[in-house]
Amino acid sequence: MTDILIDNTATEAVRALIQAFSLVPVSQPPEQGSYLLAEHDTVSLRLVGEKSSVIVDFASGAAQYRRTKGGGELIAKAVNHTAHPTVWDATAGLGRDSFVLASLGLAVTAFEQHPAVACLLSDGIRRALLNPETQDTAARITLHFGNAAVQMPALVQTQGKPDIVYLDPMYPERRKSAAVKKEMTYFHRLVGEAQDEAALLHTARQTAKKRVVVKRPRLGEHLAGQAPAYQYTGKSTRFDVYLPYGTDKG
């Protein structure tokens, strides 16, 4: 469970949103560790003893730059966005890649199992829907709170298989800016790093119709030690493409 401190300035929209997640309301910050803070119209992640915070904001910062100046060309090639219109992001996290995929015109279903992270992402999507510059992109993202490995097979039964399953398992950040390093420190302390990568990749390959795309560091190891069918490599990032079971091209 994650503590959430609800300030008296928190709007009704924020108060209603946080009720959807398994969060523990508290009257003061914990003595150590991380917690969520709901104040005004935003939910943020805080670390005790630190002044900075983490929020999901698709209208400014890196998200705004990628939206207005371009970006995402490599990921667009990896998912073959013109031919494959539906993507399930099984490791949504703070939603950056989900937003990039949605900005390419794809219908994105995002899964996040950690309640605090899902709350942060849901809050970011909510505010993006209210902004004329981001609302069209945000409207293409549907967030599911829960374990993707469990939820995807069930969702296939009602919606059918997506064209693409996208995975971005956490890995150590290297050669990043101080701001990104601090954000990832907050994130790793909150959710930890344990992931059953083999099981996740297995479920993804069972779920996708066309391909599974895995984001990795350019020189990083293959996910679960399994070699992909092919790769798209950039300066710092690599996208490994795996084919669904029983297919020979994607």
From Swiss-Prot:
Which UniProt keywords are present, listed alphabetically? Cytoplasm, Methyltransferase, rRNA processing, S-adenosyl-L-methionine, Transferase
Any one GO CC term of this protein is:
cytoplasm
> Would you identify the family this protein belongs to, as annotated?
Belongs to the methyltransferase superfamily. RsmJ family.
Q: Where does S-adenosyl-L-methionine bind?
A: R96, D97, D168
Which reaction equations make up its catalytic activity? guanosine(1516) in 16S rRNA + S-adenosyl-L-methionine = N(2)-methylguanosine(1516) in 16S rRNA + S-adenosyl-L-homocysteine + H(+)
Q: Name one GO molecular function term.
A: rRNA (guanine-N2-)-methyltransferase activity
Q: What does this protein do?
A: Specifically methylates the guanosine in position 1516 of 16S rRNA.
Where does it reside?
Answer: Cytoplasm
Instruction: Please identify the protein, giving its name as recorded.
Output: Ribosomal RNA small subunit methyltransferase J
Under Enzyme Commission nomenclature, its number is 2.1.1.242
Disulfide bridge partners, by residue number: none
